[in-house]
């Protein structure tokens, strides 16, 4: 244990210590009584004045005491945070402390607090006050008579403070404390702010004597008088750090300040030890234990899923309302999809011809049918114009989803971004999934647990469509408050008011369905949910005749409302072209619903050829629009139609005949020979029987590996729009040109001798290879039969059959080669 008295307090050594504090610390001395000019002694007045800027005795940085002189430290004299203002602003210290010194001794004056903290009955004489702004206190040096000890003076002050607590104006919840300075305080101005933890270093009192490390019990006995201690930590026994040290953690910072200023430099002797130990105190930043962080890093299997769930919940709570707002905005923007141009001015004739179809669709939008509306027709048949410009003209709350842009996007991120743009879903962080995938992979490789940060394409598409569905429901119920049926439930109101539901138009449905079928499956399921919940009407626009398969899977128990669009009749096509050529003066007549009349006044003289040209061009809407544009620039009908046919022939030649990369972009399931076979046969017959084509050698026995499946080849050519397959009672029956102008384009290709000879040569070469394979097969079987030890009579019929087949194939090869020789001659002579 520690002895009850101070064993040793060394005197200050001159020239030792830190640099002077200059302007940051002031010593205040009491003035001595002076003599007046008349020789009479002046009445003693207790005033305090600032001394010079020297710190400590002889600028040593320490406070020296003489016999019968001691030091008290008063706490809570200055605001503790005042040092943060003054520490790096030494030029302001003079002005600030001058205010303190010049102020009256009121309760606001810190010097007045010191005076109030010392009772008048105390037998001491204050000789010097040294403020410590950084620590919020002050040293008070005093002298005392021989009849009393400093410890008795300390006890008297402690009792006085307990009986008469003095609370400064800046801290009314804590009283001023004073304690006797036992050690040798160090007046430093370093940037070391007070902390609640003190580091006590045990250094030798004399250079020759090793210090003694104090026990926790001794440290507690020594420091507890200054304030409540939360913990005492001794140095590890195996630590080789010198000097030895210990940590004392106080509950309050001001208690640590009081202990540090009173005990620093204190010399004592541990009970049972012969050597003296000096205590050197300093503030230490307490290292907080990272218990929470350690638990988090130690339990990744629990923490990572929780973080993922929190991020998901945060995303839903913050971003989903914003996304729903943008979806509603895009749905209600009736001008977003209705951007007409000059080419749409003559569609009234077409819409008059299809008025029954328009009325049928509009009637379905006014009823609770609970099924899809499907508008199917070849590309360029005007399905989009029919729906957007006539059926939905003037209707609010229409959302258009173009599947072409979605499925043609590159990568999953592009698909998500395009789908979000179609429905107005923003903000969308399509790039974040790639980053999440890398983070997920890194976590899984280190912890063995999949964090679930990344999402696949299916889940992201589902999330976008679900958010869109919620926004569409809000749109359907937006005008409910002003309706007489406002008291109905949501489901009952939606069922009772089909006219209030928004309309979803899904354009280019099943475009390139073989590439991203999952997108179409999700869109079909989403549309089915909207229809069954009476949230919206759904209209599908498609050119694919096999649309019923994915839609029946999504809505198996309903019959679709199907609208089939075909090519225009010659009369309607003629009206359409003429209406496109109308002048601006005739626009009012067209708006009033009058059917455009054909008169010599409105037609140019060369339009007499229009009937013949339209018969050659056909009734496909896009081709008629091209014809009208050419006529507007001054071309004659024959010249315009001839150019259109030539352009179509060049397109067919480039896409199907003269390259290995057809419409399938490297994944085609047909061969060039098969395409030419159809072109040549349709040019002469206009219509082919489906099964007849399947049985032809070019399709049934193709030598091209990717085109060996005849039905797949025909379906692929139909998807590429080279041909159109017509059905009868649900089965494929006939094959025709992909669009009417292709019929004329096929004939134009046959008129080209070089193209005809080159493609016929390719077909004959393939047919010769097919017959050669038949001969090889027959010869192989004859070789097996000839190797038998005896020739049984049962094999005679088989041998004769094989020989006849071999002979027939050989005759075909001879005929093919003879024809091929003529074709080669044409190729060598024609340019």
Curated annotation (Swiss-Prot):
Coiled-coil region(s): none
Transit peptide: 1-48
A Gene Ontology term for the protein's cellular component: mitochondrial inner membrane
Keyword Transit peptide found: yes
UniProt subcellular location: Mitochondrion inner membrane
GO biological process, one term: mitochondrial genome maintenance
Example of a GO MF term: RNA binding
Membrane-spanning residues: 302-322
Source organism superkingdom: Eukaryota
Function recorded in the entry: Plays a role in maintaining the mitochondrial genome and in controlling the mtDNA escape. Involved in the regulation of mtDNA nucleotide structure and number. May have a dispensable role in early maturation of pre-rRNA.
PANTHER family attached to this UniProt entry: MITOCHONDRIAL ESCAPE PROTEIN 2
Family stated for the protein in its record: Belongs to the YME2 family.
Protein name in UniProt: Mitochondrial escape protein 2
Gene label: YME2
């Amino acid at each position: 244990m520690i002895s009850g008295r101070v064993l040793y307090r060394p005197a200050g050594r001159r020239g030792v210590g830190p640099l002077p504090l200059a302007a940051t610390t002031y010593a205040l001395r009491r003035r001595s009584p002076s003599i007046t000019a008349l020789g009479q002694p002046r009445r003693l007045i207790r005033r305090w004045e600032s001394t010079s800027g020297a710190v400590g005795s002889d600028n040593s940085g320490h406070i020296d005491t003489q016999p019968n002189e001691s030091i008290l430290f008063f706490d809570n004299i200055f605001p503790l945070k005042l040092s943060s203002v003054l520490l790096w602003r030494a030029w302001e210290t003079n002005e600030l402390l001058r205010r303190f010194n010049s102020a009256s001794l009121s309760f606001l004056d810190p010097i007045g607090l010191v005076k109030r903290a010392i009772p008048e009955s105390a037998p001491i004489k204050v000789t010097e006050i040294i403020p410590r702004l950084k620590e919020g206190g002050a040293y008070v040096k005093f002298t005392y008579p021989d009849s009393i000890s400093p410890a008795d003076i300390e006890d008297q002050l402690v009792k006085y403070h307990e009986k008469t607590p003095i609370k400064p104006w800046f801290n009314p919840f804590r009283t001023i404390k004073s304690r006797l300075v036992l050690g040798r305080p160090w007046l430093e101005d370093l940037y070391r702010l007070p902390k609640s933890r003190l580091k006590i270093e045990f250094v030798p009192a004399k250079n020759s004597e090793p210090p003694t490390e104090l026990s926790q019990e001794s440290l507690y006995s020594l420091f507890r008088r200054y304030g409540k201690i939360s913990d005492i930590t001794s140095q590890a026994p195996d630590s080789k750090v010198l000097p030895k040290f210990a940590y004392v953690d106080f509950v309050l910072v001001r208690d640590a300040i009081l202990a540090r200023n009173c005990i620093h430099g204190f010399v004592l002797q541990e009970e049972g030890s012969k050597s003296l130990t000096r205590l050197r105190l300093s503030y230490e930043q307490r290292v907080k234990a990272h218990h929470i962080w350690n638990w988090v890093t130690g339990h990744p299997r629990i923490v990572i899923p929780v973080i993922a769930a929190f991020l998901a919940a945060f995303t839903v709570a913050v971003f989903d309302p914003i996304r729903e707002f943008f979806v509603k905005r895009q749905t209600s923007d009736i001008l977003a999809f209705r951007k007409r141009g000059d080419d749409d001015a003559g569609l009234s004739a077409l819409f008059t011809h299809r008025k029954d179809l328009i009325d049928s669709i509009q009637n379905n939008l006014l009823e609770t049918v609970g099924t899809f509306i499907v508008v199917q027709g070849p590309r360029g048949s005007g399905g989009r114009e029919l729906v957007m410009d006539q059926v939905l003209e003037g209707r609010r709350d229409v959302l258009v989803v173009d599947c072409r842009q979605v499925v043609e996007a590159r990568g999953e991120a592009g698909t998500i971004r395009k789908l979000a743009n179609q429905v107005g879903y923003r903000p969308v962080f399509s790039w974040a999934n790639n980053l999440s995938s890398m983070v997920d992979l890194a976590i899984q490789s280190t912890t063995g647990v999949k964090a679930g940060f990344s999402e696949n394409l299916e889940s992201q598409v589902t999330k976008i469509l679900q958010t869109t569905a919620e926004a569409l429901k809000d749109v359907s119920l937006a005008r409910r408050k002003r309706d007489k049926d406002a008291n109905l439930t949501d489901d009952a109101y939606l069922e009772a008011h089909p006219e209030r539901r928004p309309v979803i138009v899904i354009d280019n449905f099943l475009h390139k369905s073989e590439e991203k079928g999952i997108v179409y499956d999700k869109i079909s399921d989403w549309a089915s949910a909207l229809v069954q919940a009476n949230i919206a009407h759904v209209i599908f626009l498609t050119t694919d005749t096999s649309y019923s398969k994915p839609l029946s899977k999504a809505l198996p128990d309903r019959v679709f409302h199907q609208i089939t669009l075909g090519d225009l009749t010659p009369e309607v096509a003629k009206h359409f072209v003429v209406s496109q050529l109308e002048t601006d003066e005739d626009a009012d007549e067209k708006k009033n619903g009058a059917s455009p009349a054909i008169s010599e006044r409105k037609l140019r003289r060369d339009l007499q050829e229009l009937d013949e040209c339209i018969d050659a061009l056909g009734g496909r809407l896009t081709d008629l629009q091209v014809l009208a544009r050419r006529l507007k620039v001054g071309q004659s009908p024959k010249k315009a139609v001839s150019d259109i046919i030539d352009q179509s022939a060049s397109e067919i030649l480039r896409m199907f005949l003269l390259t290995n990369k057809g419409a399938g972009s490297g994944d085609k399931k047909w061969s060039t020979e098969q395409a030419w076979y159809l072109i040549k046969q349709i040019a002469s017959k206009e219509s082919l029987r489906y099964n007849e084509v399947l049985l032809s050698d070019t399709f049934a026995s193709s030598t091209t590996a990717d085109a060996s499946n005849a039905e797949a080849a025909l379906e692929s050519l139909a998807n590429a729009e080279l041909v159109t397959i017509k059905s009868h009672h649900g089965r494929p029956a006939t094959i025709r040109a992909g669009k009417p102008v292709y019929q004329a384009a096929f004939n134009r290709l046959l008129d080209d001798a070089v193209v005809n000879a080159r493609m016929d040569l390719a077909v004959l070469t393939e047919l010769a290879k097919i017959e050669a394979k038949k001969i090889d097969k027959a010869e192989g079987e004859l070789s097996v039969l000839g190797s038998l030890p005896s020739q049984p009579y049962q094999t005679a019929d088989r041998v004769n059959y094989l020989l006849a087949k071999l002979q027939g194939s050989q005759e075909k090869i001879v005929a093919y080669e003879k024809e091929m020789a003529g074709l080669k001659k044409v190729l060598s002579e024609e340019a």
